[in-house]
Amino acid sequence: MSTQAADKPAARTPGAVRAGPGEFLFDLGTVQKIMGGPAYSTAHGPCVEGDRMIVGLMRMKAGTGAEPHSHPNEQWVYVMEGTFQATIEGKTIEAKPGSVVYIPANAVHNGKATPEADVVFFTVKDASYGLHGIKKAD
């Protein structure tokens, strides 16, 4: 075992890859895919965590998405393919490729792919909490 593996902290998000000392490049095409929010979302894809940031390349199948939830960390969503419809603190938006969506910490929000096509997005969160959020109670 290398000293890098021994010095590598555990990921906060189950199944995510944790960057360790001397690791600078990650091929998201080969990183294990995880659920973006197992209790409330269909988003899935590879996720890598550093000391202060978490990144993920997520996909939601056409017409599927996330139920209302929140998380104590803020989030950015960069739409790469498809259309991402979201409601953030009661305001509904529609983000197309090239759009960046900001979700403040603790904001109740949901998001989904339109029925016409899958949505693919690159997401970034601060690593204070992990990738997964808290489903809003019914």
Where are these regions (language model features)?
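Short beta-strand His + acidic residue motifs that chelate non-heme Fe in jelly-roll/DSBH
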Residues: A66-P68, A86-T87, I103, H109-P115
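Structural motif
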Residues: W76, T83-Q85, T92, V108, ...
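Conserved short histidine dyad/triad with adjacent acidic residue
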Residues: A39-S41, G56-H71
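Short acidic-glycine-tyrosine-enriched beta hairpin
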Residues: K91-A105
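Well-ordered beta-strand scaffold positions
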Residues: M53, M58, K91-I93
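Ligand-binding loop in jelly-roll beta-barrel domains
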Residues: A105-L131
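Short, conserved beta-strand element in jelly-roll/cupin
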Residues: R59-M60, H71-A86, V124
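A short, N-terminal "cap"/entry segment at the start of jelly-roll beta-barrel domains
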Residues: M1-R52, K136-D138
